[in-house]
Curated annotation (Swiss-Prot):
Antibacterial protein. Strong activity against the Gram-positive bacteria M.luteus, B.megaterium and S.aureus. Reduced activity against Gram-positive bacterium B.subtilis and weak activity against Gram-negative bacterium X.japonicus. No detectable activity against the Gram-negative bacteria E.asbriae, E.coli, P.aeruginosa and S.marcescens. This is Defensin-B. Disulfide bonds join 3-34, 20-39, 24-41. It comes from Anomala cuprea (Cupreous chafer beetle). Keywords: Antibiotic, Antimicrobial, Defensin, Disulfide bond, Immunity, Innate immunity, Secreted. The keyword Metal-binding does not apply.
Amino acid sequence: VTCDLLSFEAKGFAANHSICAAHCLVIGRKGGACQNGVCVCRN
């Protein structure tokens, strides 16, 4: 999942990071965040 496609911000909250984290949880990771436009999952 690329964060550029999901990037939008509302009232200072970057939704792309939470969408990335949710994506990582779905695939069995411990969450994640966007780094340079790419969703990076934690192990």
